């Protein structure tokens, strides 16, 4: 009844994807068909990424990856795409101090290739070359988020 390492009833950490889904998908091509004509310069592309996680029940969590992409030629919007892509994850056996990194680094890392492909397909289907979003460093995003929350907490802790 004891494992070889001597731990009793130790549960090895597990991370399972129970479901993946598109929560919201929007593609706007306001200048079509003129926006589809060739242009001298490559458009300026701006991409914003956000990750949220919420408990569902027990060890199940809903992790949502939001990607917003906008292409501009000067001040004219060529296209705007928004994808809210979610996954339901069952997470068990991780120490409590590892839960936030699992939710905000590992889960979005698993969702990202699917979300990236959806954005590439929708931009291609909108008449543009597929937008292949560069890999995202979710670890760096998480570290930045933690630093911002700590700075915010320090500001709130300072008496007026």
Swiss-Prot record:
Any Gene Ontology biological process = protein folding
Q: Which domain of life is it from?
A: Bacteria
Tell me the first and last residues of the signal peptide: none
**Species per Swiss-Prot/TrEMBL record:** Agrobacterium fabrum (strain C58 / ATCC 33970) (Agrobacterium tumefaciens (strain C58))
Homology family:
Belongs to the SecB family.
Keyword set, alphabetical order: Chaperone, Cytoplasm, Protein transport, Translocation, Transport
Q: Which NCBIfam families match?
A: PRK05751.1-3, secB
Query: What name appears for this protein in its UniProt entry?
Result: Protein-export protein SecB
């Amino acid at each position: 009844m004891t494992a070889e390492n001597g731990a009793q009833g130790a549960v090895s950490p597990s991370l399972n994807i129970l479901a993946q889904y598109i929560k919201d998908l929007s593609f706007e091509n306001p200048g079509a068909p003129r926006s589809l004509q060739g242009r001298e310069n490559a458009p300026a592309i701006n991409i914003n990424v956000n990750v949220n996680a919420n408990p569902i029940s027990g060890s199940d969590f809903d992790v949502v990856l939001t990607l917003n992409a906008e292409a501009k030629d000067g001040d004219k919007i060529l296209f705007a795409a928004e994808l809210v892509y979610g996954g339901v994850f069952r997470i068990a056996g991780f120490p409590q101090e590892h839960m936030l990194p699992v939710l905000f680094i590992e889960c979005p890392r698993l969702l990202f290739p699917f979300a990236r492909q959806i954005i590439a397909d929708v931009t291609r289907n909108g008449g543009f070359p597929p937008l292949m979003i560069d890999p995202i460093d979710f670890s760096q995003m998480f570290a930045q988020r933690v630093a911002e929350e700590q700075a915010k907490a320090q500001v709130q802790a300072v008496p007026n």
